[in-house]
């Protein structure tokens, strides 16, 4: 990979790390057992996990078998370093400093993130699961939604599950937005993404509807009505994001920066409500 390709890659992976940490911190604010070691462990494990999952996904582009993907992934010295420090530092730290709930949810998030990168044999041909309609988007939505539960640990706050559902829907929307600039690539690669199947315009209409309905999770329980404002602010941010994509679907400002910024807005709103004593 040359220098010109390295720069956008590291920028993109940095955005993913920042967005994932924003969701971890959103859940951590609800955690009843906040310690600096737990905080640092969550940061290290999440950052390493994001690099591993998304780089392994890049290695699956040619419908290689899962073992072939692993071999290709490990040929990169940076990947070797990330895996080594994950085994030597992250796993022991997670085992000793994370509660069972956080450890389990973090493992599930990692497995879901890897799930859509796996290739299976269908009719004698290797088929990447991410090529199947919506499999990738649902996996990403659930995996990132689980990050909230990872941060929260064994907390049983009534706001936690609605927040998990809300984040999962919003990240699902975001994953489809990231597919918008790749319609031609998906066509060539046989990936059945939503924009490829429905087209950009209809896909955006579906996403607008999902965005509008996503905040309903905060009004199911009357005791959580205060959180509706949180949901509406995020929904408005996403509405602006989708409008930008409607006019410039291939512009990375809308499909990457503003899109991933949704996770930061979620954290900001959770933090404000936390400081106000509502959480």
Walk through the language-model features, giving the residues of each.
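Extended hydrophobic alpha-helices typical of membrane-associated regions
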Residues: 65-73, 124-133, 202, 220, ...
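Select subsegments of transmembrane alpha-helices in polytopic membrane proteins
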Residues: 10-17, 76-86, 134-142, 201-208, ...
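The first (N-terminal) embedded transmembrane alpha-helix
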Residues: 7-29, 141-147
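Intramembrane alpha-helical segments
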Residues: 71-155
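Solvent-exposed interhelical
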Residues: 45-96, 169-215
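Short, Lys/Arg-rich, polar N-terminal cytosolic tail immediately upstream
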Residues: 1-8, 123
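Hydrophobic alpha-helical transmembrane segments in multi-pass integral membrane proteins
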Residues: 143-155, 213-217, 264-279
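Membrane-embedded alpha-helical segments that form the functional core of polytopic membrane enzymes
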Residues: 23-56, 103-111, 156-177
């Amino acid at each position: 990979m040359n220098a010109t390709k390295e720069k956008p890659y590291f920028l993109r992976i940095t955005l993913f790390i920042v967005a994932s940490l924003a969701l971890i911190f959103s859940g951590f604010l609800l955690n009843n057992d906040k310690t600096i070691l737990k905080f640092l462990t969550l940061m290290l494990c999440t950052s390493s996990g994001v690099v591993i999952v998304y780089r392994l996904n890049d290695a699956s582009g040619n419908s290689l078998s899962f073992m072939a993907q692993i071999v290709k992934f490990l040929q990169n010295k940076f990947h070797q370093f990330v895996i080594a420090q994950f085994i030597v530092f992250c796993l022991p730290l997670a085992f000793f400093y994370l509660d069972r709930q956080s450890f389990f949810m973090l493992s599930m998030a990692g497995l879901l993130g890897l799930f859509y990168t796996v290739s299976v044999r269908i009719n004698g041909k290797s088929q990447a699961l991410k090529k199947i309609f919506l499999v990738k988007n649902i996996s990403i939505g659930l995996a990132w939604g689980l990050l909230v539960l990872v941060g929260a640990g064994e907390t049983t706050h009534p706001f936690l599950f609605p927040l998990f559902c809300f984040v999962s829907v919003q990240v699902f929307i975001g994953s489809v937005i990231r597919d918008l600039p790749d319609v031609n690539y998906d066509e060539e690669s046989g990936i059945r993404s939503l924009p490829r199947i429905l087209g950009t315009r209809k896909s955006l209409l579906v996403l607008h509807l999902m965005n509008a309905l996503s905040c309903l999770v905060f009004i199911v329980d009357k005791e959580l009505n205060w959180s509706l404002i949180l949901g509406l602010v995020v929904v408005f941010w996403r509405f602006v994001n989708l409008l930008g994509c409607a006019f410039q679907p291939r512009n990375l400002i809308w499909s990457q920066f503003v899109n991933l910024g949704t996770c930061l807005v979620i954290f900001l709103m959770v933090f404000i409500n936390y400081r106000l004593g509502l959480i």
